[in-house]
């Protein structure tokens, strides 16, 4: 989106990602001009594991994933009232997000999008990343694929021209 000339403000609790605003969104209250778009991607690890069979050792976790970050993102969206908004996550989040966010609006590769945004086409050519274990694997996998953000930004720009 930055490549297309958008002003982008990033918010994250992890300073390693070098966000513009480093904070916990569960206590964050935005003040500033109303953005055209808010994109939230709560961590998907619990939801990714939730979609695996219970017998898998890596799936030994609480029965219910924590949806507090999604709820915080939705609270911010409701408070700020941008024209467009997206909350993105994985297939394992669907049953937890639908009661609050409504039906999935778009699926692109392994990513599921809820929100209010113009529908767009996007080649999910990025697929599931097969990355070896590493210290920054989770950070790399959490990045929004360039094709996806570009397709959405073009759709928003096109709808603004109408």
Task: Locate the predicted segments by residue.
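Class I S-adenosyl-L-methionine
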Residues: 12, 26-37, 44-162
């Amino acid at each position: 989106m930055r490549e297309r000339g958008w002003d982008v403000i990033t918010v994250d609790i992890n300073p390693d990602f070098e966000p513009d605003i480093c904070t916990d969104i569960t206590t964050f209250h935005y003040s500033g001009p109303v953005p055209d778009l808010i994109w939230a991607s709560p961590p998907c690890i619990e939801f990714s594991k939730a979609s695996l069979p219970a017998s898998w050792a890596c799936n030994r976790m609480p029965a219910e994933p924590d949806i507090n970050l999604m709820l915080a993102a939705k609270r911010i969206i409701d408070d700020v009232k941008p024209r467009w908004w997206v909350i993105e996550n994985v297939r394992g989040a669907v049953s937890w997000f639908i009661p609050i966010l409504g039906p999935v609006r778009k699926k692109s590769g392994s990513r599921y999008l809820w929100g209010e945004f113009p529908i767009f086409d996007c080649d999910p050519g990025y697929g599931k990343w097969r990355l070896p274990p590493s210290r920054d694997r989770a950070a790399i996998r959490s990045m929004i694929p360039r094709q996806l953000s570009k397709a959405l930004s073009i759709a928003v720009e096109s709808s603004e021209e109408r």
